[in-house]
Each structure stands twice: as C-alpha cells, then as structure tokens.
Amino acid sequence: MGSLASERKVVGWAARDATGHLSPYSYTLRNTGPEDVVVKVLYCGICHTDIHQAKNHLGASKYPMVPGHEVVGEVVEVGPEVAKYGVGDVVGVGVIVGCCRECSPCKANVEQYCNKKIWSYNDVYTDGRPTQGGFASTMVVDQKFVVKIPAGLAPEQAAPLLCAGVTVYSPLKHFGLTNPGLRGGILGLGGVGHMGVKVAKAMGHHVTVISSSSKKRAEAMDHLGADAYLVSSDAAAMAAAADSLDYIIDTVPVHHPLEPYLALLKLDGKLVLLGVIGEPLSFVSPMVMLGRKAITGSFIGSIDETAEVLQFCVDKGLTSQIEVVKMGYVNEALERLERNDVRYRFVVDVAGSNVEAEAAAADAASN
C-alpha cells in the first residue's frame, strides 16, 4: 500500500497568464487522504477546453494553471480506505475530481451536474488548494473519480475517451438514442466529432457528418465510416436533407447558427449541444414548435458512464485517432488544435517526457 506523503513537490506545465503559453511549474500536491489514489501520469489528451481555460476565454481562469483532464496513469500509492484500486493499476481521471455527494445529481450518480463539483484543474479543492491537471508528473485523486482502464485498451488510446468519448456516449444513452437503425448527424469533425461518428456507427446508426466545407469528406466516409456527408453551405444539399435525422450531436465549440441544423431534424428530433460557447445562440421558435423538436445539451458523462464507454470501445474495437507528442511540443500542439490542424486528438506522452529538459529545448528552438 505504501505510506502516503502528506505533501510532495511535482513539476507540471502551466499557463501563467491569458496568452495561454505553458512552461514548467513546480508546485506542491494537496495532502493525501485515506480514500485518495496517487497516480503517476502516463498520458494526457489535449482538449479544446484546455485552450479556453488557458487563454481565459470563459473569464474565470486562475493562474498558474496546469491544464489536462484526459489523464491516464499508473497507481503508485493508495490510501488505507481505498478498496477499488491497487498499486500498478492503470487508471483514468477526467474532468471532475470532486462533488458534494448530497445533491440530487450526486445521489443519481450524475455527479457532473453537481453545482459544487470540483474541476480537475482551475478550481479549488476542499482543503483550499488549487487543483492542477494532467500536464504534470503526478496527481492525487479521490478514488470515486478514478476509473480502471480495461484490458485491451492502450493507455494513450484511452486518454481521449475520458472526455471526448464519454461526451458523445452520455447523451446518446440518456436520450434513448442507442437503438440500431437511427439516423444521426455529427456536426463538426474534431476530437469529439470523430468519436461521435465511431460510437454512433458502432451502435448501428446511419451517420451523416455535417461540416462547413467538403475538405473532410474523404476522411469522414472512407476512414471513419460515415454514411453521408453534408456541406452546410450547400443550400440545395441541405434542403434535400430536411426532416431526415433523428438527432444531431453538435460538437462545434464556436458561435454558429442553429436554424440550418434544426431544419434537418425529423419530428421529435433532438439537437444536442456539446461545444463550450461563450456567446448566446439564437433561433426562431417556430423552428422547434412546428416539428416538436428539442434543443438540449449534455456535459461530459458520469464516472459510471466513463467506465461504460471504455468497455464499449473495447467490445466494439473502437480507438480514437491520435497524434502522440512530448511535453516540449505542447505549445505547438495547442496552436495547431486552435487552427484545427490535428486528426483528431493530441495526446501528450507525459511519462516519456523530461519536463525540465524539454522546456530548455523548447525555449532554445523559439529563440
């Protein structure tokens, strides 16, 4: 079991201000408790939300900030009351590391909707210390917010499933959209969208990818297995596809009109918003009234759903398409992600990186 150190110094890569530039940062992990798991970080995926947070797009960033919420690591120590995990287990940590455990969402095991949830970074833990994420060598996490990575799933492949994977799986399950034969749309083909295509296809759905241009058509259909591809600026094609979809999973993280996509939905169709957008979205009410259509949202998934989607991907043979990078490349990776220059998810090889040495190399390369 090992004796848990009350405090320990670690090095992560942190943003110091709204430029979002990351550099090495030494800090002390929070005190460990009886139900805590100490995780040596192996890999951490890069999510578009990491950009929003590092650059203070949402207006609530606190610095220094170590991002990263798609964390896969190895358990190196456990508290005396930890029963679910042992040293050597490969585990995952996602967006949430704390909740009140008393509210209705917590009692319903959908703790991601708890109003007192604690984010894995850019938040304050119950002891008053800031939480820091997975772009670091080590994390301390309550066992409730840790999931086992099942056998048959490579750790680097598992990382994006802890956010992108469960983010598309959860609404499909919750809204009863898992039956084979449904016709679904995936709006946006980034890290979340590409997993949306894969998960929906594995459920037996007819999947249409909707994008602003035709440049991803071959990838969507030939590589990811989509059944159809719609260019949203092609008025004739959009009109021909009206009233054809049971649901649309909207993964676009920037402001965009909703009405063109509402027109694609059948009677009782659902438009599920997943992208984090800081500006109001608008539509005219008849677009939903005349087809009894619903605009709704979903936020990541519960710990139980995270475990489910990991096993679902193992059972269905699904993997995320990733580009593995070292920590010294993380700033370039964030810049490339911001301009959509990745297919489809960056994953940082944290354990294989020397954060201090790679920082010096990155600084030398920029001079």
Curated annotation (Swiss-Prot):
UniProt EC number: 1.1.1.195
GO terms of biological process kind: lignin biosynthetic process
Single GO MF descriptor: cinnamyl-alcohol dehydrogenase activity
Residues annotated as binding Zn(2+) 1: C47, H69, E70, C163
Keyword Metal-binding: yes
Catalytic activity entry: (E)-cinnamyl alcohol + NADP(+) = (E)-cinnamaldehyde + NADPH + H(+); (E)-coniferol + NADP(+) = (E)-coniferaldehyde + NADPH + H(+); (E)-sinapyl alcohol + NADP(+) = (E)-sinapaldehyde + NADPH + H(+); (E)-4-coumaroyl alcohol + NADP(+) = (E)-4-coumaraldehyde + NADPH + H(+)
Residue positions binding NADP(+): 49, 167, 188-193, 211-216, 251, 275, 298-300
Cofactor list: Zn(2+)
Result of knocking out the encoding gene: Reduced lignin content, and modified lignin of reddish-brown color.
SUPFAM superfamilies: GroES-like, NAD(P)-binding Rossmann-fold domains
Assembly, per entry: Homodimer.
Protein family (similarity comment): Belongs to the zinc-containing alcohol dehydrogenase family.
Protein name per its UniProtKB record: Probable cinnamyl alcohol dehydrogenase
Organism (species): Zea mays (Maize)
